[in-house]
Amino acid sequence: MSDSVYRVTEVIGVSPESWEAAARNAVETAARTVRDLRVAEATRFDVTVQDGKIANYRVRLDISFKYEPGN
């Protein structure tokens, strides 16, 4: 097995539908600009409230991807 280094960054996904949809939005959006995305770990879940009702579900994710020198 070759040596590898991974970078971890935090993203927040938002959806009016569900936490799952919020996580999917975050991963799919990050994957458009981050190559070799490997793992997404949900670290926090919360909601925004408007007029006494849930307006949006939010998921904070730590995403990891293979580090390439020069990036």
Give each language-model segment a name.
Residues 1-2, 71:
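Basic/polar N-terminal segments that are highly enriched at the extreme N-terminus
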Residues 2-5, 9, 43, 53-55:
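Amphipathic alpha-helical hairpins
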Residues 4-37:
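Short, well-ordered alpha-helical segments
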Residues 12, 43, 64:
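Residues in well-ordered beta-strands of folded domains
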Residues 36-40, 66:
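Short amphipathic alpha-helical leader/targeting segments
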Residues 40-49:
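Short, conserved loop-to-beta-strand elements that form functional interface hotspots
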Residues 52-71:
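C-terminal structural segments of small proteins and small subunits
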